[in-house]
């Protein structure tokens, strides 16, 4: 899922921490994705974002934790700033459609190792 973040001026992943049946494989896949995205895109970071839910306290009314809990999925929400990224600001243009496209491309490239791993090709 992809959202625009109104408050936090960062690109980050909101995950499914706190779901009742959290599996280590799910966590490993999300961490692999985030690490790969860090390598691929200077606008992505992992130090800022929403605090993770405590174990067993995920809000299952939100799509990401619902999908992870209900289907064992590796679900994520990519949050992007509406105005600009504080981590790599561009004062003249702010957060732009071009930067969004570049981040989207990076996300697809970061997903490749996950797909390979799920297929047993890693």
List the model feature ranges, each with a label:
Residues 1-122:
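Structured catalytic-domain cores with a bias toward divalent-metal coordination
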């Amino acid at each position: 899922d992809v959202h625009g973040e109104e408050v936090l001026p960062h690109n980050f992943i909101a995950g499914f921490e706190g779901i009742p049946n959290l599996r280590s494989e799910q966590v490993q896949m999300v961490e692999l994705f985030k690490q790969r995205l860090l390598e691929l895109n200077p606008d992505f970071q992992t130090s800022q974002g929403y605090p993770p839910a405590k174990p067993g306290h995920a809000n299952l009314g939100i799509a990401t934790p619902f999908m992870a809990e209900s289907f064992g999925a590796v679900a994520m929400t990519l949050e992007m700033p509406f105005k600009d990224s504080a981590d790599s600001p561009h004062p003249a243009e702010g957060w732009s459609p071009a930067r969004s496209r570049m981040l989207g491309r990076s996300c697809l490239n970061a997903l490749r190792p996950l797909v390979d791993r799920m297929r047993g090709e890693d």
